[in-house]
Regions:
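Hydrophobic alpha-helical transmembrane segments of polytopic membrane proteins
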Residues: 19, 106-114, 177-188, 260-298
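Generic hydrophobic transmembrane alpha-helix motif, especially the helices
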Residues: 109, 132-187, 264-266, 272
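An internal, D/E-rich "acidic patch" concept
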Residues: 56-113
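Transmembrane alpha-helix signature in integral membrane proteins
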Residues: 9, 16-17, 21, 89-120, ...
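Hydrophobic alpha-helical transmembrane segments of membrane transport/permease proteins
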Residues: 16-65, 156, 160-173
Length: 313
């Protein structure tokens, strides 16, 4: 396991380096307005002097080296547009907590409803609970997310008696965005748990339990469900972290001052330093989620040995 994790972390670091470096290079192809708050009022000489002071006239490999050197010391530069001369790390530290809170609540909601739904669907395969659950999953996956997000906001704000401007101090303002963020994962957990339970139900140990007279409910809860949860567990950390960093539309829709709205604003206003800092954070979060998924899977089922799996390839 340790050897596997070492290899996985090494590959993840390489992936992180490639992704962020590629984005860094692409941002250098963008107009230079993103580095100056008052670009329209500046002369060409002032622009060139500013670019020189920021090191943007250096050769690209030199710029990449300086970026990673500073990033490894916790310095992602300063915002030039969003908040003039404010450190990128400070802005990220201000915006990330509310996105994490939203993500935690959405994950809990999706697990609380998605796991029981998948369990019931797997237990009653082909019967009306399974058919109703399947219809719900198909509806969530077939309809574009933006459509049901808008409907939830349209009818939910009236029913909840809340406005369109988010108020973090009032719990009612959290209900609609959290419900919206949880729907996709709820359907995902239910669909895959149902599928894994159906697969487990056809295995020999289940047939043996039935032959011994064990009740179907006992088999479903204590044997099939437990084994079906093992492959599903590895997706929970990455699903949670993807919810945190992938809530761009939800946060913009409800004016939530989190990471999603920050990315949209910085892209629209061409704040290149902020964009590359956000991309670095997102890449780190995604990679951490994948590694945590593997670790959690082994903790739940010690029979899994990634080292042997890799060695057999």
């Amino acid at each position: 396991m340790v050897q596997y994790l070492a290899k996985r972390i090494g590959r993840s670091i390489l992936t992180l380096f490639v992704i962020v470096t590629l984005v860094f290079c692409l941002l250098r192809l963008m107009p230079v307005e993103g580095y100056f708050a008052n670009y329209e009022k500046m002369t060409e000489a002032q622009i060139q002097a500013g670019l020189q002071s920021m090191g943007l006239l250096d050769p690209l490999p030199v710029q990449i080296g300086h970026f990673w050197r500073d990033a490894l010391h916790g310095d992602l530069g300063v915002s030039h547009i969003y908040k003039l001369n404010a450190p990128v790390t400070r802005i990220l530290a201000q915006k990330l907590p509310i996105s994490i809170e939203m993500g935690v609540l959405a994950m809990l909601l999706s697990l609380i409803f998605g796991i029981p739904l998948g369990l019931v669907m797997g237990r009653y395969k082909g019967r009306w609970p399974d058919k109703l659950g399947t219809a719900f999953i198909v509806l969530v996956q077939a309809v574009p997310a933006a459509v049901y997000f808008l409907y939830i906001q349209m009818y939910g704000t009236t029913a909840m008696g809340v406005g369109l401007l988010f108020d973090a101090a009032n719990w009612r303002y959290w209900v609609l965005p959290v419900c919206s963020m949880s729907l996709a994962n709820l359907a995902f957990y239910a669909m895959w748990l149902r599928r894994y339970m159906v697969d487990e139900s056809n295995k020999d140990y289940v047939k043996l339990a039935r032959a011994k007279g064990v009740s179907e409910n006992n088999i479903a809860l204590h044997h099939v469900f437990r084994n079906a949860m093992v492959p599903l567990v590895q997706y929970i950390p990455s699903a949670f972290l993807n919810t945190v960093v992938g809530s761009i539309y939800i946060e913009s829709l409800y004016s939530i001052p989190g990471m999603g709205g920050l990315l949209v604003t910085c892209v629209q206003r061409h704040d290149n330093t902020m964009v590359q800092g956000i991309v670095l954070l997102y890449a780190c979060v995604g990679i951490i989620g994948l590694i945590l998924g593997d670790v959690l899977m082994v903790l739940i089922d010690p029979r899994i040995n990634f080292g042997k799996k890799e060695g057999g390839r």
